[in-house]
Amino acid sequence: MRNLDDKKPEQRLPADLTRRATAIIEMPNGVLVTAPRGGRYNLPGGKANRGELRSQALIREIREQTGLRINSMLYLFDHITPFNAHKVYLCIAQGQPRPQGEMERMALITSPDSELELFVESRAILRRYARLRGEESAKGQALRAILKLARYIAKVD
């Protein structure tokens, strides 16, 4: 699946905002979150380097943090905070996640209201994703179809 979002010109953002790519990776038992040593859990992803598309940054960061290889991604939405400008993607990944690089821990969560110590930004993104996933809009229906297909492919592999 090709990410069409990269065809759009970058929205003009204040210079002090960090351009981040954030992944929602649904595993069979929940959404993957990661944490560095002594830190809170966060959705995987990271900062885009100068001249790097956020979708490219996401592929690199996911590999560095979890060892997963992204097979495809679907742009979901932008999430702007006072410090970060996230592009949020649903990612279909291959492999078994393992903490790597700066990440020490991983967990799977089934609700944005999990009691896990989760960054506020990640919790807000997960709430928005849960709403989108439950919508009867074309995007919500497409999202559910993609997840169903990803689960089928995982069983076949």
Predicted segments with their positions:
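Acidic, metal-coordinating catalytic segment for phosphate/diphosphate chemistry
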Residues: 1-22
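A generic fold-level signal
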Residues: 16-18, 26, 83-84, 101
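Conserved Nudix-box catalytic region and its N-terminal flanking loop in Nudix hydrolases
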Residues: 26-65
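Short histidine/acidic/glycine/proline-rich micro-motifs that form metal-
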Residues: 48-49, 113-115
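A short coil-to-beta-strand element that immediately follows conserved catalytic motifs
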Residues: 69-79
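Active-site-adjacent beta-strand/loop module that shapes the phosphate/pyrophosphate-binding cleft
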Residues: 79-113, 121-136, 142
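Acidic/histidine-enriched, glycine/proline-rich intrinsically disordered or flexible terminal extensions
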Residues: 134-155
